[in-house]
A protein has these predicted regions:
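N-terminal small-residue-enriched
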Residues: 1-183
Length: 183
């Protein structure tokens, strides 16, 4: 596989990828994908996802919709709204009952690991989806206050010292299931 997993490091990540050594293989894979037969079946099928596809799916389908500024419509004209409205908190069946998705700003070597967010809130770990149910949001100080909370869960991010912090996705991962569960 030529894809590099995201890491919180510098250009040494690119240098170690051996891009030139993978040119032929990557080109062959691209041609193979272009000529792959289209799925024409009806109904259910088995789909095997690479980890890079799974983390992108979680990022887009759970991360962005649970950014509380998006839920409140702050980004409606730019990036859309969310199905995870506040009246659905602790009620919305977001996934199958055995699914747990954890936000964790303390995860070692995570892309969004920090000691404090960009509003000075200490890094935390919390369930966004617990047993398949919407359990919490990604908040900054403003959205946490609007939700009636005394503090944020530390999801504020600014891309520079001169930018206003916004709610952004922390390290968001699928938690392993219980031993013996096979779904």
């Amino acid at each position: 596989n030529y894809e590099r997993p995201p890491l919180n490091i510098g250009y040494e990540h690119i240098d170690s990828a051996d891009l030139l050594g993978n040119i032929e293989r990557v080109a062959e894979e691209a041609i193979e994908k272009v000529h792959a037969p289209e799925f024409t079946g009806d109904g259910k099928t088995t789909l095997i996802l690479k980890p890079s596809n799974l983390f992108l799916t979680i990022h887009e389908s759970v991360g962005h919709p649970t950014e509380l500024d998006r839920v409140y419509g702050y980004e409606a004209n730019f990036a859309g709204t969310s199905l995870a409205t506040t009246d659905n908190l602790h009620q919305l069946q977001y996934a199958s009952p055995w699914i747990n998705l954890v936000a964790d700003r303390t995860q070692p070597q995570g892309r969004s690991t920090v000691a404090y967010d960009d509003e000075g809130v200490p890094a935390q770990r919390w369930y966004v989806v617990k047993d398949g149910i919407l359990n919490d949001y990604l908040t900054d100080r403003e959205t946490a206050f609007r939700l009636g909370r005394g503090s944020s869960n530390g999801s504020a991010f600014a891309d520079s010292w001169s930018s206003t912090p916004m709610v952004r996705i922390p390290n968001l991962g699928l938690e392993p299931g219980k031993p013996g569960d096979s779904h």
